From Swiss-Prot:
Subunit organization: Part of the 50S ribosomal subunit; part of the 5S rRNA/L5/L18/L25 subcomplex. Contacts the 5S and 23S rRNAs.
One protein family per Pfam: Ribosomal_L18p
GO process terms (BP): translation
Keyword rRNA-binding: yes
The protein's role, per its UniProt record: This is one of the proteins that bind and probably mediate the attachment of the 5S RNA into the large ribosomal subunit, where it forms part of the central protuberance.
Descriptive protein name: Large ribosomal subunit protein uL18
GO cellular component: cytosolic large ribosomal subunit
CDD domains given in the database record: Ribosomal_L18_L5e
PANTHER family xref list: 39S RIBOSOMAL PROTEIN L18, MITOCHONDRIAL, LARGE RIBOSOMAL SUBUNIT PROTEIN UL18M
Length: 119
């Protein structure tokens, strides 16, 4: 019997393939992105120490937008970039989390680039 793969399993498999190649350091942390139905989350991770350096999401108190659309994702990208620049982090490695580089993921990346992050 053939078994149909669901989207979440396929995304997890893609994410594992991407994570084999992408590694964040303290000088150039990994910008990890997660997308749910209602919100979008981003964090800068130092994989050497295993610590989150900066995080931003559409579920934060200061967020004035909708996390389930592209405009909200762009705002989260700008928020993460501003927090990173405050900590002196300019260069990052982008980890799309197994999601296709399209829609909200792409807007978050473009918002972070516009606000000053380099990747």
């Amino acid at each position: 019997m053939f078994k149909k793969n669901d989207r979440s399993q396929s995304r997890e498999r893609r994410h594992m393939r991407v994570r084999k190649k992408i590694f964040g350091t303290a000088e150039r942390p990994r910008l990890s992105v997660y997308r749910s139905e209602k919100h979008i989350y981003a964090q800068l991770i130092d994989d050497v120490e295993g610590k989150t350096l900066v995080a931003a999401s559409s579920s934060e108190k200061g967020f004035d937008g909708v996390g389930s659309n592209k405009e909200g994702a762009k705002l989260v990208g700008k928020m993460i970039a501003e927090k990173a620049l405050e900590k002196g982090l300019k260069k990052v490695v982008f980890d799309r989390g197994g999601f296709i580089y399209h829609g909200r993921i792409k807007e978050l990346a473009e918002g972070a680039r516009e606000a000053g992050l380099d990747f």
